[in-house]
Design a protein with these regions (language model features):
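Exposed, low-structure sequence patches enriched in small/polar residues
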Residues: 45-47, 200-204, 219-492
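Bacterial N-terminal signal peptides
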Residues: 9-17
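Short glycine-enriched, charge-decorated loop/helix-capping segments at active-site entrances
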Residues: 114-117, 474
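Short acidic, glycine/serine/threonine-rich loops at helix termini
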Residues: 110-112, 155-156, 197-198, 269-270
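Outer-membrane beta-barrel transmembrane domain signature of Gram-negative proteins
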Residues: 119, 187-207, 212
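Bacterial N-terminal signal peptides that target proteins for export
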Residues: 1-10
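Alpha-helix capping and helix-loop boundary segments enriched in small/acidic/polar residues
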Residues: 119, 162-166, 198-199, 235
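Beta-barrel outer-membrane channel/assembly domains of diderm bacteria
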Residues: 21-114, 121-146, 152, 159-162, ...
Length: 492
């Protein structure tokens, strides 16, 4: 058995040799972070993530390194993590054969969706092999086989959400074609063989298809997916169905998007992580259970009646099929006015009501106005942002719900493209032990220094309020933070 360090040295040596070869192009990005907590033990958090792409003729490759190191003592789920990923692909014009780590989404994600989200620190990837063929009539065929790995940052630590199911096998195929300029369709099949399935014939399948059409300024899209699984423990067929419909219309200066979705026992597995992540109509990214039992719709309208004025309105609603006590409604109006090239004003108002979405919260309503202003003066940039959130919260065991306010303000000054300074403050006018550990004020100071065009250093000192945050239907609760965060992003 060759030690891991020896294998890594061999790979690095091989990479150095390849770099010297003519015709090889290399590019990538490295993000290094260090957190220091102002707590009783002065805990620290070190993280580094590097992604490198290599290309030599028809050969492609990627190299990914991830390191997470929390300071001791390691308690519960807080453990260090080391990940090493690679991809090797042969990619002529009409064909690609890939082995290693990859991301793949079929359609809108009703059958399969994987992705990488650095801002939300969520990395859901496949590891295996994939073949892609590009055929006439704008036709693409994808076949894959591999295993899922879902890495997510929550409770101030990285976790592999599917750590008990990393050996489950995923196989799938997808066909998409557009035989006519105005019409296209597709079909897909995904099969998951789980280690914990009660019998060899007990597996989960996703079978679906989609159609799209365009006429003038109008585009319509529809996707249907059926899940065929096995009831856990007792066996027997477990079926689910979901569909997604959308339509867009756009003319000069105006656009309208409408979408409708219905997911009934489609999300799999039912809790924790999912192989599929269907769209949510909620702009802020909130979902109930990511396709297990959801139904909703959303509408977005934009307008530019005059050149300096931009208007946008969004409305989304999501609820369960037979449960009136669970759901979310969100609407937002936004306007942006730029009287000149140096000055921009933006105002928006967001309203959201959540019922039984957050843990231990029966209902939470927010009304949040926000104002932003940006002014360019020579080489200087001045930006001001202020918001004031009116919150009503009910834990389900209260005679009178809580009513409190969450203000926030920040002022930024930038000089040229090299330096940006920001001072900010967040607060709450009520002591909330469960949500904010009884804290009520979070000041901070941040400096962003563009050392070169390819290297950016960001240092933040102070505190962050945290709270419930979502992206693409995946949500987490971020605890308040006090300390120092330093981040260096390097591109090469």
């Amino acid at each position: 058995m060759i030690p891991r360090a020896v294998r890594l040295c061999f790979l690095v040596s091989a990479f150095v040799s390849l770099v010297s070869a003519a015709g090889l192009t290399v590019q990538g990005v490295n993000r290094a972070e260090f957190w220091a907590f102002f707590d009783s033990v002065y805990a620290t958090h070190t993280e580094d993530k590097m992604d490198m792409d290599l290309r030599y003729g028809d050969l492609n490759g990627t190299l990914g390194l991830f390191m997470y190191e929390p300071s001791r003592p390691w308690v519960g789920l807080q453990q260090p993590m080391r990940l090493f990923d690679y991809t090797v692909a042969y990619s002529p014009k009409q064909l690609e054969i890939l082995y290693g780590k990859f991301f793949q989404t079929f359609g809108k994600g009703l059958a399969l969706r994987t992705y990488s989200d650095d801002d939300f620190r969520h990395y859901k990837s496949m590891n295996g092999c994939r073949g892609t063929a590009h055929l006439p009539l704008s036709t693409e065929v994808v076949a894959l086989a591999g295993r899922l790995r879902d890495v997510f940052f929550q409770e101030n630590t990285y976790q592999v959400l599917n750590r008990t199911d990393t050996t489950d096998q995923v196989m799938g195929a997808d066909l998409s074609t557009q035989p006519l300029e105005w019409f296209g369709f597709g079909g897909r099949y995904v099969r998951v063989n789980g280690q914990n399935d009660p019998a060899p014939k007990a597996f989960t399948e996703f079978v679906g298809g989609n159609m799209s059409a365009a006429y003038g300024p109008v585009d319509v899209y529809g996707e249907l997916c059926q899940r065929l699984g096995t009831k856990p423990g007792i066996g027997g067929r477990d079926k689910g169905l979901g569909y997604y419909l959308s339509g867009t219309a756009a003319v000069s200066g105006y656009s309208l998007l409408a979408e409708y979705m219905d997911y009934d026992t489609l999300g799999y597995p039912a809790a924790g992580y999912h192989y599929n992540d269907p769209p949510t109509p909620i702009k802020s990214g909130v979902a109930i259970d990511r396709g297990v039992d959801e139904k909703g719709f959303g509408v977005t309208a934009t307008a530019t009646p005059t050149n300096p004025l931009y208007l946008e309105a969004d409305y989304g609603r999501l609820y369960r099929h037979k449960d009136n006590l669970t759901g979310v409604v969100e609407w937002e109006g936004k306007s942006r006015f730029s009287p000149g090239t140096d000055l921009t004003f933006e105002a928006k108002f967001n309203h959201m009501v959540q019922q039984n979405i957050e843990l231990h919260v029966a209902g939470r309503g927010t009304n949040k106005p926000t104002l932003q202003a940006n002014y360019l003066l020579g080489q200087s940039t001045i930006a001001l942002e202020a918001e004031y959130d009116f919150v009503t919260e009910d834990t389900g065991r209260m005679v009178v719900p809580w009513k409190y306010h969450e203000p926030a303000v920040s002022l930024s000054y930038g000089y040229g493209a090299a330096l940006l300074f920001t001072v900010g403050w967040q607060g709450v006018d009520m002591k909330l032990d469960r949500r904010y550990n009884g804290e009520q004020s979070w000041p901070m100071f941040e400096t962003v220094w563009s050392i070169t065009e390819r290297n950016v250093l960001r240092v933040r000192i102070g505190a962050e309020r945290g709270g419930y945050t979502c992206s693409g239907g995946v949500c987490r609760f971020e605890s308040p933070f006090k300390g120092v965060k330093a981040q260096l992003i390097s591109r090469f």
